[in-house]
Amino acid sequence: MKRVCIVGASGFTGGELLRILLQHSGVEVVCATSRKFKGEYVYRVHPNLRGFTQLKFVEPTIDAALKADVVFLALPHGESVKWVPQLYESGVAVFDLSADFRLKDPNAYVEWYKWPQPHPYPDLLAKAVYGQPELHREELVGARLVAVPGCMATASILMLAPLAKFGLISAPPVVDAKIGSSGAGAEGSVVDLHSFRTYVVRPYEPVHHRHIAEIEQELSRLAGKEVKVAFTPHAVDIVRGIFTTGHVFVEKMPTEADLWKYYRALFGDSKFIRIVKDRLGISRYPNVKYVLGSNLVDLGFELDARMKRVVTFAAIDNLVRGAAGQAVQAFNIAMGFPEDEGLRHIPVAPI
């Protein structure tokens, strides 16, 4: 039984970590921190947890976290880096859901996250495992510092990974992403208020979005060469979910059989990835509607011979597979639990 502390447990991601870990047979949640809600019952902030826990929020301190064997950091970017060195040095396993240990180049944090200087702990950065289980499974076994990938990066990387791995990417892919309002977090801003967000389809950070750094890092690793990506996200009028479409212009068109072979080679054994390309039924390509509440990734593709283009698709729940669920999946592999422990959720439909 692993004793777990969730630091930053009052936000959407923290709430999802609680929801999942409270159902995990190998975990005891001993600590949930929140400066704002210190002393309050967890279920008063996360009403869906009423009747499942009597846990109260505590002040976020290193001492509180060190009562656990494993710490999940659900903190804003730039905050986790203040916690990780001492936790790691104390022997605690850390699963960081911020971006603070995702990028391998210390200098990348200056460009992509506007840090005033390169990453202050390059040694820990080198030790951190990028926590995308399907692509880093062997590295995750026994890992003590895991950087959980970003939500839109997760969908983008997984849908393009087979094309990168099997040499189809010669020109920069173009990625269009759409994300629900929960991606902005529990605090939000004025544009996340109901009157602004309802009916919206709005681009934001249309160039140089920070998730590009992760996408390029991982696709370059798979391709064995530098891969650059044109990426534009959009805020849309849903609460949960991410849908990404990738456009890959190729030198030589693959066949449909080739693409099935590539996707199955990379993801055929995955417990959570479904290849959705059907000739019948009401959902012939991936659809956010049919992954909500789950750790599933639905991937699909189509061929455009006229334009020598492969179109790829991915649908995930941003709070589960894009954050808490992927963190627990990585935790399970690292700690020797069944990979799907606590994550056997069939998506809710209709919704």
Curated annotation (Swiss-Prot):
**GO BP term (any one):** arginine biosynthetic process via ornithine
- Source superkingdom: Archaea
GO (cellular component) term, any one: cytoplasm
Q: Which InterPro entries match?
A: AGPR_type-1 (IPR000706), LysY (IPR037535), NAD(P)-bd_dom_sf (IPR036291), NAGSA_dehydrogenase (IPR050085), Semialdehyde_DH_NAD-bd (IPR000534)
A molecular function annotated in GO for this UniProt entry is: N-acetyl-gamma-aminoadipyl-phosphate reductase activity
Instruction: Kindly identify the residues recorded as the active site.
Output: C151
Bilayer-spanning residue ranges? none
Q: What does this protein do?
A: Involved in both the arginine and lysine biosynthetic pathways.
Q: Which family does it belong to?
A: Belongs to the NAGSA dehydrogenase family. Type 1 subfamily. LysY sub-subfamily.
Record's protein name: Putative [LysW]-L-2-aminoadipate/[LysW]-L-glutamate phosphate reductase
